[in-house]
Amino acid sequence: RRVLIRDSKLVGADLSLSSLQHVTLASCEARYLNLSQSRIRDMSFTGCRLDECAISQTALKGVIFDQCQLNRADFFETPLKGIDLSSCEIAGIQLSGKELVGCTVSPLQAIALAQLLGLLVKEDW
């Protein structure tokens, strides 16, 4: 029941409204991947390019993002509690702010997210 997808092209794949369990995507090119309104459990994304993917209104449980490119990814209305994005690129990530409760990010990501949410970050204190 475990699926490994490695070194594959999933550019623009529409997996919206799907239910995914025990899946690993490794070193995949998956820009524009659509996982919106899906239920994802025990899934791992490792070294994947997921720029501009849509993961909005999605239930995530036991999901790992490791060394992924998530630039301009849409996580609107997807709770990220328990998700660690600290090893990923997340420039221009799309969300309202409430999704970030309980999400782990690096210090530099925290500064960028604060600015994205409209905070003015003062560098000299």
Residue map of PLM features:
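Tandem repeat scaffolds
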Residues: 1-125
